[in-house]
Structure formats: structure tokens, C-alpha cells
């Protein structure tokens, strides 16, 4: 009987260790995915500011109000 108890405790302990290792790896993967999402959103924000700056420059060159040029660019980007 004592042998069965020890075996059962050993199996449960190893299962618990295995489970905690899997959960840790899962958390690490989620953190990596979150970092990738953050990097992608930063890139999108950077591209949007570049487009906005180009739109402002184009508006100044064409003597149009900057808001009208930005509106046209926003519509063009939104259609894609």
C-alpha cells in the first residue's frame, strides 16, 4: 500500500511540474505575440504620420487647406 501511495504522489508531482512548465511556455508565447502586435501598431502609427506629413506638404504646395488634403488622404487610405 505504501508503494502505491509513493507511486501516486510521484505521478501527481511530475504531472504538476509538467503542467506548470507548459503554462509558463504558454505565457511566454503570449508575451511574444503581444510584443509583435505592439511593434506592428507602432509601425502603422509611424506610416500614418509620414502620410500625414506628405499630405500637409502637398497641401501647402497646392495652396489647399491642410485639413482638406488630410481628409482626401484619410478617405483614400480608408478605401484600401
Curated annotation (Swiss-Prot):
Protein localization: Secreted
Organism of provenance: Agalychnis annae (Blue-sided leaf frog)
Listed name of the protein: Dermaseptin-A5
Recorded superkingdom: Eukaryota
Cited function: Possesses a potent antimicrobial activity against Gram-positive and Gram-negative bacteria. Probably acts by disturbing membrane functions with its amphipathic structure.
Signal peptide as annotated in the record: 1-22
Predominant location category: secreted
Record's GO cellular component terms: extracellular region
Acidic residues bias locations: 30-40
Keywords attached to this entry: Amidation, Amphibian defense peptide, Antibiotic, Antimicrobial, Cleavage on pair of basic residues, Secreted, Signal
Propeptide residues according to the Swiss-Prot or TrEMBL record: 23-43, 79-80
Pfam families to which the protein is assigned, alphabetical: FSAP_sig_propep (PF03032)
Sites bearing Valine amide, chain numbering: 77
Spans annotated as Disordered: 24-45
Disulphide bond pairs: none
Record flagged with keyword Secreted: yes
InterPro entries: Frog_antimicrobial_propeptide (IPR004275)
Sequence similarity: Belongs to the frog skin active peptide (FSAP) family. Dermaseptin subfamily.
Expression sites (tissue/organ): Expressed by the skin glands.
Amino acid at each position: 500500500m505504501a508503494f502505491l501511495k509513493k507511486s501516486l504522489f510521484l505521478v501527481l508531482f511530475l504531472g504538476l511540474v509538467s503542467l506548470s512548465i507548459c503554462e509558463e511556455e504558454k505565457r511566454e508565447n503570449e508575451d511574444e505575440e503581444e510584443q509583435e502586435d505592439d511593434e506592428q501598431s507602432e509601425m502603422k502609427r509611424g506610416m500614418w504620420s509620414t502620410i500625414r506629413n506628405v499630405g500637409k506638404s502637398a497641401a501647402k504646395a497646392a495652396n489647399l487647406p491642410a485639413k482638406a488634403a488630410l481628409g482626401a488622404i484619410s478617405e483614400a487610405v480608408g478605401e484600401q
